[in-house]
């Protein structure tokens, strides 16, 4: 998105209702990556999970997948899948695999476990499978051990390890990718 702010699909929908077009919802980012920001309700009001589904439905209705023909689609959702709405991308057939990216911080491990439990709960229904865990290092004590234990608890593997770098935080502050 080249450091530009993105309007969320929910905000655009609330303004335009039926006149929402694909070009309104998408932004071409670095090296042709197509970006979409679903958005959410005012904190304390509404259902964020329902907002995610509405955004996914609008992308489908406007032919996003046929227009852009993406090689891969990534959904970056919160780890708080206690609300069933956050598991909707996998339950509605929008995801084949779930990859959990977590650090060894206790709350991150807890969120990762919640995601893994949600995937397990739907395992017999033919929804998305757990594809593994990626360690996003924060350099906390016993980090690798804790993430490995999480993987073992859910019969999966640690499939990648990201090194902690302040460059990631700097890029995020600028609204850019690390590669930019």
Could you tell me what each predicted segment is?
Residues 34, 51-58:
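Membrane-embedded hairpin module used as a gating/binding unit in multi-pass transport
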Residues 16-20, 56-57, 80-81:
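Short gly/ser/thr-rich secondary-structure transition/capping motifs
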Residues 54, 61-72, 77-161, 170:
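Conserved catalytic-core segment of NTP-binding enzymes
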Residues 43, 164-170:
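A short acidic, often aromatic-flanked loop/helix-cap motif at beta-alpha or helix-coil junctions
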Residues 39-50, 106:
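Flexible beta-alpha connector loops of hexameric P-loop NTPases
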Residues 10-13, 157-164:
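Beta-strand->loop->alpha-helix junctions that form or flank phosphate-binding loops
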Residues 1-38:
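N-terminal phosphate/diphosphate-binding loop that engages ATP/GTP or pyrophosphate donors
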Residues 172-180:
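C-terminal boundary of histidine-terminating zinc-finger modules
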């Amino acid at each position: 998105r080249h450091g530009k702010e993105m309007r969320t699909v929910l905000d655009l929908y609330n303004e335009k209702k039926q006149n929402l077009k694909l070009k309104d919802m998408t932004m071409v980012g670095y090296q042709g990556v197509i970006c979409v920001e679903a958005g959410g309700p005012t904190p304390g009001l509404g259902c964020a999970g329902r907002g995610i589904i509405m955004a996914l439905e609008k992308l489908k209705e406007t032919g996003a997948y046929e227009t852009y023909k993406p090689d891969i689609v990534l959904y970056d959702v919160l780890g708080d899948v206690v609300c069933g709405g956050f598991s909707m991308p996998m339950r509605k057939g929008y995801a084949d695999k779930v990859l959990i990216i977590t650090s060894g911080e206790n709350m991150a491990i807890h969120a990762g476990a919640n995601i893994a439990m949600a995937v397990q709960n739907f395992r017999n229904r033919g929804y998305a499978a757990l594809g593994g865990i990626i360690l996003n290092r924060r350099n906390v004590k016993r980090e690798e051990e804790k993430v490995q234990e999480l993987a073992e608890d859910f019969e999966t593997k640690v499939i990648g390890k990201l090194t902690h770098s302040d460059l990631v935080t700097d890029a995020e502050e600028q609204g850019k990718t690390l590669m930019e």
